[in-house]
Amino acid sequence: IDLTLQGATLSEESIREHLKSILDMDLDDGITWEMKSISPIRHDDLYGGFRVKLNAAYEKIIVPFSIDISTGDVITPAPQDFIFMSRFSPNGNFRIKAYTVETIMAEKIEAILSLGILSTRPRDYYDVHMLLSTVKYDESNLSKALHLTATHRDSMDTIKEWSEGLKLIQDSKTM
């Protein structure tokens, strides 16, 4: 799970504090949580981030997963509200703010073009293909999101040369 904080301090202590208050909530759903670790990520990013490793337990089922938490990413045009229906809790639906599909695609396209043949993320190719072929999106917002993402990540020169980058990927024997 990726999480972007807006208007909040990003530190190991603040993350531990906020997550503890969330994980300690009794939702009467039978799920218990254990925070395993918090470690820094995105060392090359101006804003950095943290990876939180957790275990969720439901009866005898234990599911390990991680949350990557960062701040400073550009969300274009703005975060959207999504309503999700709980499968476990009788309390029903819950709302979250999430990236727009255009921002998700922009980040994946930027990663594909920036990393090129050095990419170790085949899921980005799959995700872009699936999103382009199954989800409605606004081309103008995608263009804006890609421009802002590349500017934020200081990769605009690479993005401007996208056709050469795609040719290298296409001709690669390892991709």
Feature roles, as predicted:
Residues I1-M175:
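Compositionally biased terminal segments of proteins
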